[in-house]
Amino acid sequence: MDNQEIKLLLIKKLNLEQANITGDSNHIKIIAIGNIFKNVSQVKRQQIIYAPLIDMIKEKHIHAVSIMSYTPEEWEKTKK
């Protein structure tokens, strides 16, 4: 599964406003932006993002993941 497919999967499954995926199957970096993260701890946010990817991780199609997650409001603040 390539980065574009991962992006579309996360957007669809998690109803994200935006997802940016970089890297390769050895290590992917995910920046996820969506209202699903409102009032959710960082640990729970990571669990939410891992859920649709878990089979790919188990099957070793993805080896390492770096996750950054934001609500739309948090994302806007990072851009200033």
Curated annotation (Swiss-Prot):
Xref: Pfam families: BolA
Domain of life: Bacteria
Signal peptide: none
InterPro entries in the cross-refs: BolA (IPR002634), BolA-like_sf (IPR036065), BolA/IbaG_stress_morph_reg (IPR050961)
Family: Belongs to the BolA/IbaG family.
The name this protein goes by in its record: Uncharacterized protein BU385
Organism, as annotated: Buchnera aphidicola subsp. Acyrthosiphon pisum (strain APS) (Acyrthosiphon pisum symbiotic bacterium)
